[in-house]
Structure formats: structure tokens, C-alpha cells
Swiss-Prot record:
Species assigned in the record: Lemur catta (Ring-tailed lemur)
Pfam families in the cross-refs: Cytochrom_B_C, Cytochrome_B
Binding-site residues for heme b b562, renumbered to this chain: 83, 182
Cofactor: heme b
CDD domains, A to Z: cytochrome_b_C, Cytochrome_b_N
Phylogenetic classification of the source organism: Eukaryota, Metazoa, Chordata, Craniata, Vertebrata
Domain of life: Eukaryota
Name the UniProt record assigns to this protein: Cytochrome b
Amino acid sequence: MTNIRKNHPLMKIMNSSFIDLPTPSNISSWWNFGSLLGACLALQIITGLFLAMHYTADTTTAFSSVTHICRDVNYGWVIRYLHANGASMFFLCLFIHIGRGLYYGSFTLSETWNIGIILLFTVMATAFMGYVLPWGQMSFWGATVITNLLSAIPYIGTNLVEWIWGGFSVDKATLTRFFAFHFILPFIIATLVMVHLLFLHETGSNNPLGTSSDSDKIPFHPYYTIKDLLGLMLLILLTMTLVLFSPDLLGDPDNYSPANPLSTPPHIKPEWYFLFAYAILRSIPNKLGGVLALVFSILILAIIPMLHTAKQRSMVFRPLSQYLFWILTADLFILTWIGGQPVEHPFITIGQMASILYFSLILIMMPVVSLIENKMLKW
């Protein structure tokens, strides 16, 4: 008798990806975040679809349509807050997923890593455009400030900004196109996720030791399906706690005021997950320099495989590199905090020091320390 799971054209793709997939036997809970990101993406697409049924992408009605969703639509408030806080959970899982890749040397799987960087940029663009849609004060001014950064590009900058706006300021045309892009991008992300998995399954997963797992693999199901399910339950618990007890904890109170082009909020700041990059942007007085630092703060991930000077792939047996990794983590926390503070002393200086430390750690300290650790192997 033929096994439909292994022979059916569609089923065998699912089977080789999620059931009979040979997986390293020792991957830890840090490997759970890939599946959690998939769950977050599914949540965002489903809740987003229901929100789009009631939302109107027009400057006169956008704000009131979001209010209508929260007040008049059945469980509209749950859907709206699941979508808003789901984005926060998405980025939390994303940062941990990237951190795990850095710590355990998963960036040596270059195709998977590069698709991951493209995914990160796409998710960030999607989240930014989504934040503009409620058309509150922070939505409007956030859109104005961030899109205006493109005007720093020499010669074509101003034309480029006006082309993106669809006019001479952020207005109806901007909101309409941002809604269109915000709707389509998650499906592009889902396609990129499939490519990400395709490349991952070409090489197989890394493991905490950074060694070859070829001699010791186990089937993905039931071992890791159960393990991922536990992670999913914990993620649902955290998300629902946030949604039901403190839905506005991570939001900005200014976004409960309708957009007013004539009144600038005292402190314009993005959502928490962009604050680290925003702090790096603000730490450089020159506009073009700030924009380049902002882009490079994320694009730097692409050159990490080239900066890998260690003989060992993982940081598990490299205590000095571990020390620098956790300093980098602490530095990102500091940058996130600084990004939410006003531009005044001492925050400016702290932000500049943290930005210098961020680039120094990745570009200089980590490669040098890895070389020292290589020498230590011979002692």
C-alpha cells in the first residue's frame, strides 16, 4: 500500500518540511522562535484581514473607522489589539531569532541568512506603514519624519520624498498607498518565508555546538512539533495577557489624538521595536550621516559572515565572545531606552556612546577577540 503522506505531490512537500524532516537531536528552545515567527505572521494576516474589512483608507475617516472597529464591531477591540500587540510579539521573536543566529553561528548558512535580512527589512517596512494607518498624531508625524529622511539623498532626495507622498505633504494619497502596501507586503513576506525555509532545508539546521549533525538526526514530528507547541502556548499566554490586561502598554498616547498637520507632538518617536535604530539615527548631527548609520545599523548583519574570524562556529566554547555578545545585547537595550527619550543632555551623549559601541563591537571587537580565542586554543 502506498503512503499518501509520502507520495501525494502536495503532501510529500509538507511531509519533508514538517514531519519526516531530519533535525539535529540537540537543538534547544532558542530554535523555537522560527515557528513562533510563523505563528505571528499567521496571526497578523488573519487579524489584519478582519481589520481591513472595516477600515477606510481616507484621511477624513481613517481615525474614526479605527474607533468604530473598537466600539461597534463584534470583538473588534480584541482584533485590533491582537494586531497591534501581535506586531510587538513578532519583533520580540525576530530579535531573539537573530540573536540566536549570531550566538550560535547560524549566519554561516549564507543563503538562509541573507533571505532573513531581506525579510527583516520587509517586516520593518510593513510595520512602519501599518503604524501610519490609524491616522493619529504619532502616525502622521512619524510618517512625515521617517519619509523625510529620504530627502537626505543628494540630488534626487526631494523629488523622491514627494513621489512617495504623492503630493507636497503626507496626505490622502500617502495614506491610500501605505494601506495598499501594508496589505500586500505580508503575503510577500510569507513567500520569502518559504524561500527562507527552502534554503534552510537544503543545508539542514545548525545546532548549539555548531558541529555537523549528520550522524545524529531525529524526525521533526513528534519531537519538535510538541516542543514548538509548548513555545506557542507560552507566546499565546504572553500575547493574551498583554491584549487583555494592558493593551496600550507599548503604544503611544499621542496616537489617540487625530492627526493634525498644524500641531507637532513634543516628542516624535516610533514604536519600541524601532527605537534602537532611531537612537542611532539621532546620534549623528548630520542628516545624511544619520540616515546612512540607520541603514547600516541593520545592513551590518549582511557582513557578519565576513567578519567571522573564529575557528569555532558557535560561541558556546568561546567565553570572551560570549561576554561581548551580552555587552552588545545590553547596548541595544540602552539604545532602545535612549530612542524614547527627548533630545537633551545627558541622553544625546549616552546615545552617541552607545552607537559608537554598537558598531565597534560588531566591526572591531568581536573579530579581534575571535582571533585571540583562536590563539588560546593552542595554549
